[in-house]
């Protein structure tokens, strides 16, 4: 059975992104194994860590989880027309050390939500741009934006 990792871009307890992700997980569980990949415990990325023989435990756990799934669903809110800092940090952590990216050749669906009328379009676009650089193949159509949520 295929395995899908779900990353919630908000680290706020009881966030709407978390609720959306939980509902998506319930739907997906019918066809695939689902694993939530936590990002709240990731220390802020620092390139000095790349030179360490032993990486922070949260980095190791996160990278192993990303490498262990066949595809990803990233559910993100929008903060000031951009992805949340915690999500950008997770993308950076998974991409390092150089040449050892956990993201390489993964497939992903990006879902965004926001209380505004643009429904997280800015955040989703930003996430997709970073994922493209990381060699993650995003699902282009259909797009999933939840406005005024």
Predicted regions and their residues:
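Glycine-rich phosphate/pyrophosphate-binding loop and the adjoining helix
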Residues: 1, 46, 137-149
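N-terminal beta1-alpha1-beta2 submodule of the flavodoxin-like/Rossmannoid cofactor-binding fold
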Residues: 1-97
């Amino acid at each position: 059975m295929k395995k899908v990792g779900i990353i919630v871009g908000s680290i706020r307890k009881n966030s709407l992104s978390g609720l959306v992700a939980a509902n998506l997980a319930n739907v997906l569980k019918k066809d695939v194994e689902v694993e939530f990949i936590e990002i709240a415990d990731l220390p802020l990325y620092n390139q000095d860590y790349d030179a360490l023989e032993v990486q922070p435990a949260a980095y190791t756990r996160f990278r192993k989880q990303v490498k262990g799934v066949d595809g990803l669903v990233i559910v993100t809110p929008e903060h000031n027309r951009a992805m949340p800092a915690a999500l950008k940090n997770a993308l950076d952590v998974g991409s390092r050390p150089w040449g050892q990216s956990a993201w390489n050749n993964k497939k992903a669906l990006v879902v965004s939500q926001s209380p505004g009328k643009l429904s997280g379009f800015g955040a989703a676009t930003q996430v997709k741009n970073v994922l493209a650089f990381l060699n993650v193949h995003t699902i282009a159509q259909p797009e999933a934006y939840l406005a005024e949520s």
